Amino acid sequence: PDNDFTILRDLTIPAGDYWWNQYRIGIDFASRRKVSGELSASYGDFYFGDRWRVGAEATYYPWKRLGLSLDYAYNHVSFPLGVADAHIGAGRALINFTTNLVWAHLVQYDSLSESVGYNSRLIWEYRPGSKLFAVFNQNYLAENLTLTLRQTEVTLKAGAIFRF
């Protein structure tokens, strides 16, 4: 990172270059079927500490134009000055109206920051390689089973490939 940043209340990661090694094992279940999933575990470097991660994902396609998935990951991070445990859960929905028009949704919870994020993207590929995006984001503080809105953002984006 170019600037120092805080990842725990008392732990700041200094600016600088970091190299990580990571070892991962995983298994995928029926990735082209109506119901699929994945289990994985990994261990490796994380800035100047190390991280264990265990994750699971389940995906369901009730019909070809709708995909629903749930993800969970547990991260245990150890640093010389402390440890952190984070639980991250997410739910996704992908609606394919046509081959050129997609609406994607993501809801994610992070126990370390006690936040819930919502992201909705409407994507229109009006020409091969050229897309318009309408993006809606909200971030909530999740404390004591109550959600408090912290931020709302609406973005319009355009992307295009120019050939010459």
Language model feature labels by segment:
Residues 1-164:
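Exposed, low-structure sequence patches enriched in small/polar residues
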